[in-house]
Amino acid sequence: MASNPLDNNMPTTPVEEKIPVASYSPSSSGSSSGASLLVDIMCGSKETEDEEVDSDEWDKPETENISDLDERSEMVRYLRASGYAKFLEKYLIEEELPVRSILKKLGINLPSALEEFEDIDLLPLLKEVLKREVARRIKLPHFNTFEDVVNLLKKAKNVVVLVGAGISTSLGILDFRSDNGFYARLARHGLSEPSEMFDIHTFRENPEIFYTFARDLLPETNHYSPSHAFIRLLEKKNKLSTLFTQNIDNLEKKTGLSDNKIIQCHGSFATATCIKCKHKVDGSELYEDIRNQRVSYCNECGKPPLKLRRVGQNKKEKHYFSDGDSESSEDDLAQPGIMKPDITFFGEALPDSFFNKVGSGELEETDLLICIGTSLKVAPVSELISVIPPTTPQIYISRTPVRHTQFDVNFLSPYCDWVIVEICKRAGWLNELQALCDLPECHSGSKTRAFETDLDIKFEEPSTYHITSTTNGSC
């Protein structure tokens, strides 16, 4: 079995044994997974209502003075140069700084819920912060502009593309984490923990929650966007190594993209499986139930067994009839299993194809990574960027920026399609992209918006582009 390079847990070090607090035990002072979850919330950009802790992001220089930034930079440099153990020894042991002070100097503002915690109980959180800082990729300084991206695309031979829901928003499909996304809609309908809709344990106990809201995720179109077409264009040019998609709409396949190029990280609506007998069906068989907010049950294990009784005096005769009126027939009825679309819920393992690809070593050959329409908040897919060699150029295309890693060039736009069309125009690929978008499988509305909107392009140093419509900022 391939090793999992996404497993980067940091072991307990001898330095922690030197910490002069008798009550501290590295094995019992907190859950590393809990600390990881807290850092996910505190260090991710605040985009939706499902994130309950409203805290500062990693980098907000406008709220800090120069000396604070210099001190943080020095601490980070020391951490990267000397390692986790030396860092703890220097700041916790030698300088005797409280854990909460170190966290604050690193840009982590504790939520009020943690203010009453004993200082030493915050050590698992500090450990998680340091682990992430060490793993965080540093931007390559020599890739900054549109021209750099065009040159990278022309030279690349092993492009990895990672996409999220933002690639399909031009088709009218909701993303998850924007202000008007799916999670925000669930919150407005009173679902206190929107992500519970995709929790496998909740689904098994109360499938009505999923079936009440799933119709908003059901693909209403079989047509792809210009951004999908761009990925197919990369394959046609023999540049695409792998597409990792977090989407469940299955639209990537509508472009004609080869199956062996696609890793569906979170499954799709293409098929569905009974959680009881594992009977598998085409996903479209559930669509009527989903659209009517009705739980879908299995037609296979839900069939009542035929109760037969032999009649006639001659034992050699084989005449039987159904005894549907028997008192025991009601007991013989099988409880049908619940049908679940083959999408990956929280609490379920990702497909083997994902881990096989990540563990195969193929990603080490990547010469360009392009992330499109994803906030990179759901592990382990979000950790792919740490598997790609840090010297590989990385491009980010989405509506909002990410704070927990550094891409080389960022393109921020209400529609990813606008960015894609502009890149292809500058690369001399516009006619080829247009040809793919002229096919009947391409969504006509998204094609018109992508190719006919006049764009306003603003550059923000050192390497971020803001791309909007010249008329009203969007369209």
Swiss-Prot record:
Gene Ontology molecular function: any one: histone H3K9 deacetylase activity, NAD-dependent
Protein's UniProt name: NAD-dependent histone deacetylase sir2
InterPro entries (alphabetical): DHS-like_NAD/FAD-binding_dom (IPR029035), NAD-dep_histone_deAcase_SIR2_N (IPR007654), NAD-dep_sirtuin_deacylases (IPR050134), Sirtuin (IPR003000), Sirtuin_cat_small_dom_sf (IPR026591), Ssirtuin_cat_dom (IPR026590)
Record keywords: Centromere, Chromatin regulator, Chromosome, DNA damage, DNA repair, Metal-binding, NAD, Nucleus, Phosphoprotein, Repressor, Telomere, Transcription, Transcription regulation, Transferase, Zinc
UniProt xrefs under PROSITE patterns: SIRTUIN (PS50305)
Record organism: Schizosaccharomyces pombe (strain 972 / ATCC 24843)
Name of the top EC class for this enzyme: transferase
Cofactor: Zn(2+)
Cofactor binding annotation: Binds 1 zinc ion per subunit.
Subcellular location: Nucleus; Chromosome, Centromere; Chromosome, Telomere
Residue positions of the active site: H266 (proton acceptor)
GO biological process, one term: silent mating-type cassette heterochromatin formation
This protein's GO CC annotations: chromatin; chromosome, subtelomeric region; mating-type region heterochromatin; nucleus; pericentric heterochromatin; rDNA heterochromatin; Set3 complex; subtelomeric heterochromatin
Compositionally skewed regions (Low complexity) per UniProt: 20-35
Sites bearing Phosphoserine, chain numbering: S55
Stretch list, region Disordered: 1-35
